């Protein structure tokens, strides 16, 4: 990891030395490097972004306050095409943690059909599909942290068509290994994902269906209704593509997501529902029982249950935004995980859209059988 970081830092250093006197036509937020071949046989865009964060936590149990300042994310990403605009690619590297996030090729082989191959995000809940650069609050919700499909390696088939003048339909199907990021071991079984997206009033402006906040101030109502079904065969990890590795007998996991995303004239709303269950057998893999055969402690289990996340914001004319979120997590009772409810209120100041902004939020977390907790976060986003 250290060698990789050294190589990246050295490359950027020499790039800055060699080109420090050049004048570029690139505006801020449009990438550090934008190059296209003279014969148009390839094109690339390279960008760098980072987030710095302050986080403070107040525990009502003992009235203690703990805080820290840290780098939340730092990433280098590249995209473009090779040979033909129909063969695109995306690459993203996590400089902060030292591993590859995305390495995917996208081939538009005919009409409205495109196949993706490599490692990238699966088409799960809408909040996860948003880039972490383009969030409305400081970070994603508890629904995402407990139920997300995250990233995986495999193949995706994507298609879209339009009814009449405006009604857009998008379909996404994927087969992946099921264990998540950067796995080197053999897969225990495959993961199958299907998603459908319905946009009855047509496309959002500038792909606004895939970023939070109505920065484009939609002049007419835009709406996306979506559903995702995921089947993870012989899931090796407690939350499918994420979580701890299961040591006992493996089960299949079945996950359902329903979401809606709406924007109009500075107002934005999205809601998500998630449900995960084991398809064969109990979610509990190993437990301690009393003499009556009732579970008194769970030693190992899959994280199953349901969650609801609702989020809304309003963008003022001066590019300040206020936003609020309610998230409820209800794990399956047999796993003995606690119900959680979280309330979040936040603000954003968009200087250059999602490329340069300051965000802050405050959250109250209520967890069954525990004292409440309060969290305050302040974050900056800087994206070339």
Show the residue positions of the predicted features.
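Outer-membrane beta-barrel biogenesis signature
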Residues: 19-46, 203-222, 352-356, 371
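Outer-membrane beta-barrel "beta-signal"
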Residues: 192-203, 347-349, 356, 371-384
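Detector for outer-membrane/organellar transmembrane beta-barrel domains
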Residues: 187, 197, 206-331
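Bacterial Sec-dependent N-terminal signal peptides
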Residues: 1-23, 384
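Outer membrane beta-barrel
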Residues: 31-181, 185-202, 221-224, 308-316, ...
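Outer-membrane beta-barrel domain signature
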Residues: 22-23, 35, 62-66, 91-92, ...
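Short sequence motifs at beta-strands and strand-loop junctions characteristic
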Residues: 25-27, 67-70, 95-97, 146-149, ...
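Outer-membrane beta-barrel translocator domains and adjoining extracellular loop/strand segments
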Residues: 58-64, 96, 100-104, 129-132, ...
């Amino acid at each position: 990891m250290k060698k990789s970081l050294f190589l990246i830092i050295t490359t950027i250093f020499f790039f800055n030395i060699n080109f420090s006197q050049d004048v570029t036509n690139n505006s801020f937020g449009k990438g550090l490097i934008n190059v296209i071949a003279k014969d148009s046989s390839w094109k690339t865009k390279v960008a760098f972004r980072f987030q710095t964060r302050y986080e403070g936590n107040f525990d009502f149990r003992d009235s203690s306050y703990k805080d820290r300042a840290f780098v939340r994310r730092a990433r280098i990403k590249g995209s473009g095409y090779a040979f033909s605009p129909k063969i695109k690619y995306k690459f993203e590297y996590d400089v902060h943690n030292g591993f590859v996030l995305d390495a995917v090729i996208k081939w538009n082989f005919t009409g409205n059909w495109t196949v993706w191959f490599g490692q990238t995000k699966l088409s799960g809940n809408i909040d996860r599909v948003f880039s972490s650069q383009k969030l409305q609050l400081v970070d994603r919700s508890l629904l995402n942290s407990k139920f997300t499909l995250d990233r995986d390696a495999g193949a995706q088939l994507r298609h879209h068509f339009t009814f009449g003048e405006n009604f857009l339909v998008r379909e996404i199907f994927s087969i992946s290994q099921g264990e998540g990021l950067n796995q080197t071991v053999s897969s225990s079984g495959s993961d199958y994902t299907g998603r459908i997206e319905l946009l009855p009033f047509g496309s959002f402006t500038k792909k606004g269906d895939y970023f939070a906040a109505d920065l484009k101030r939609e002049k007419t109502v835009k709406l996306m209704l979506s559903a995702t079904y995921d089947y993870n065969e012989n899931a090796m990890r407690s939350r499918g593509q994420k979580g701890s590795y299961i040591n006992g007998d493996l089960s299949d996991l079945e996950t359902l997501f329903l979401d809606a995303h709406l924007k109009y004239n500075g107002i934005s709303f999205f809601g998500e529902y998630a449900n995960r269950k084991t398809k064969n057998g109990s979610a509990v893999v190993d437990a301690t029982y009393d003499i009556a055969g009732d579970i008194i402690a769970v030693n190992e289990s899959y994280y199953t249950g349901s969650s609801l996340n609702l989020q809304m914001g309003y963008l003022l004319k001066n590019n300040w935004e206020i936003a609020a979120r309610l998230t409820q997590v209800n794990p399956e009772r047999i796993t003995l995980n606690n119900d959680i409810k979280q309330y979040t209120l936040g603000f954003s100041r968009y200087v250059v859209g999602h490329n340069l902004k300051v965000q802050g939020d405050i959250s109250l977390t209520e967890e069954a059988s525990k004292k409440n907790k309060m969290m305050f976060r302040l974050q900056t986003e800087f994206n070339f």
